[in-house]
Amino acid sequence: MKITALEGQKISELSMIEVAHALLEQNGKEMQFSEIIRAIQDYLEKSDDEIKASISSFYTEINTDGSFIPLGNNVWALRSWYAIDEIDEEVIALDEIEDEEEEKPAKKRKKVNAFGIEDEIDPEDEEGTKETTEEDMSYDTQAEDEDKDDVAAYDAELAEVELDNVDEEVDIELEDDEDDSDDTDED
């Protein structure tokens, strides 16, 4: 197989993308990806193993290279064969479809109770909206009264306890906490 655009160049120095571009240009029509690979393999005289090793990188290059365009069904062509207007029209058509979809009113989402209990009231949902009632206050007042009763009972027990050797004086030495806090800082 001869590719006239590549005559005079060393075959070993050519990339698969260059050969694919020249091949499509010479044929003047779109080609299946598998046909392009076979033609490149024949032209570059590569073995099946070499082609298999480089086919994934070639496919990536042909997709990212701006000079090729996929036509669907694994058929490829040169982008220069197609007028820019044709490509833009396809994009505009897609934009119009998206615009039509946006014009439809969006459905309102309904809140769904994941637990399936419709009548259960969650007190956290109503936090801050509920006024304090006498029942709420009575619990707090009752707890305070119980605390006062406990303190009074404790004081009464202390008064009943007889202290041994009350006459002896006990010396209690108080230490400065400031000195201790300086000693504990190791920074």
Swiss-Prot record:
The keyword Chaperone does not apply. Residues 117-149, 157-187 have a biased composition (Acidic residues). Transmembrane segments: none annotated. GO terms for molecular function: DNA-directed RNA polymerase activity. Keywords: DNA-directed RNA polymerase, Nucleotidyltransferase, Transcription, Transferase. RNAP is composed of a core of 2 alpha, a beta and a beta' subunits. The core is associated with a delta subunit and one of several sigma factors. Belongs to the RpoE family. Participates in both the initiation and recycling phases of transcription. In the presence of the delta subunit, RNAP displays an increased specificity of transcription, a decreased affinity for nucleic acids, and an increased efficiency of RNA synthesis because of enhanced recycling. This is Probable DNA-directed RNA polymerase subunit delta. It comes from Lactococcus lactis subsp. cremoris (strain SK11). The lineage of its organism: Bacteria, Bacillati, Bacillota, Bacilli, Lactobacillales.
